[in-house]
Amino acid sequence: MHNFWYLPVFLKWMLSTNAYCQAPPEDSATLQEPEIGRSSIDSFPTRTDHASHDLSICADSPQDASTSPSCASYLHFSLLQEEYLISSFFDIVQDANPIFSKERFLRRYHSSLCSQDLILTMAIITAKLTQFAGYDDGKHLDAGLDSLLSSSLLDDDLIGDAPSLDQFRKAYLLAFYEFHQFPGHHSWLRIGRVTRMAYRIGLDRLDYIRVLYSDWSTVSDEDIHEWRALWWRIYRLDTYSNLASGTPYLIDDVVINTSFTLRRTEDDLSQEIFLPFNSDGLSEILPSITSDTETLLNNIHTVTIATMRKAGLVIRMHLLRWQDGIVAQVANVERQLATLRLALPLGWLNLRRNAFANEKPVDHHARLITVFHLRMAQLLLSVVECGQRRADDWLSSWQRILEACQDIASLAGQWDSAFCLTVDPAITFTIFTALIFLHLQRKSNTISDESVRSSINHDITVLHLQLKHFGSIWTQARLLTLSFESFSESVSGPLAYSHINLILSRFEAPLHPRWLQFLSSARSALEDLQ
């Protein structure tokens, strides 16, 4: 591993040859979660590139998908421990959980009908994230997780054309976990493989392929629900990973023929709900979505993700420096945002818990995540628009960036850190982006009112604390925290239009290597403009 002992430590490490993840010394066999510090590069997460294990994963029965030999040799959860961890799994990262029906899954689990490989993966991830105290000193968990990540390359895990549902769930969970806990090009590539395999077997067209092919026509309605849920989780992961990295989405929204997950009865003749070909139609499917209260949160989450994807496409145009039509594209997506906000159920954008509606705290936070998506979309659009303005007409657009960041900070002000583990930590990309632009706002020479500056400082404090709470669980969030702290220390201001315009021109994506590299050297770049 390369060592860099000067600030910002993690940026130098992240931009080295292997992006984020470096191979450990040959005598290192386990994957340790780090205690990250500014001068402790050796403690950053690593993973080993072990040879793949041969697993019988294309079988039809769960018994054929046995536990990875390297894991089974040293991981021995007792039955009570395993049952506790599997039950607890449904309390964490709920909006990223690929299992549609908890009750059905637990029935199958207690009947020994689930793949032991999947059960082991769920148990290890739950134990790691919840700091499960009932299992030795954690070394065996680290070794088991290392084995799962290094021996579960997708080309081996999902070999053949028809991997089982449990095998695909396992592959998804590992891709999700690695992306947030051991970020880097390995995790990004793993997500890409999962997404492409989903296309290969037809998850993007479940409602069409089921009619044509016998192997899908015999799948039960309950299992089809589970496959649908898995597809839309992959859709979210494709969104987060590529939007954060500034790379094109692998999934094409225009050609998806897999309906949303709904709890329909046989007597319910309502039509299934599909992602509209035209993004203008997102608001039109909301009445059908809201009619199914059990899946309401889940499906609106997907709709707001789809909206955020549209803003990401505009960012791609910004990356390519396409001047023609970009302002019109910004206006078009903003119209879609406005329509969607108005079409949402009454009180959906309320920052506080809807107590009169008996909204549970966990549902309140799940709803807040969808509002974060909408605010992030607005922030991205505002950044692009501001970058198109000249010195004589940029202030109104610069103010809109502040408005979007303040809206995000208002959401953070209602956040209970106890729920950081219950949601997808991809929200940290939004928090980080808002922090960067709030710092630029407070250092710009456009802010003369001390009360406004004080409000901005408060917003930064709230968002910084929220990011640190996520960082107590996830490596990705810890790295983003370090990035913001380093950037805020290096850029002192006051910043004029020329400085801000330079920074806006360099913005590509929250985790794009060139953007992070620029943040690490922003002081010298800004001083050159003096």
What are these regions (language model features)?
Residues 300-318, 382-385, 438-441:
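Solvent-exposed, amphipathic alpha-helical segments
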Residues 162-182, 351-352, 359, 369, ...:
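Long, charge-rich low-complexity segments
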Residues 5-6, 21-22, 444-445, 451-530:
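C-terminal, low-complexity intrinsically disordered regions in eukaryotic proteins
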Residues 1-116, 137, 228, 272, ...:
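Charge-rich, intrinsically disordered regulatory segments
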Residues 379, 408, 435, 467:
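Hydrophobic, well-ordered secondary-structure elements that form the walls
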Residues 301, 327-330:
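A conserved active-site cap/scaffold subdomain adjacent to cofactor or substrate pockets
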Residues 15-20, 24-27, 83-295, 316-328, ...:
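Acidic, Ser/Thr-rich, low-complexity intrinsically disordered regions in fungal proteins
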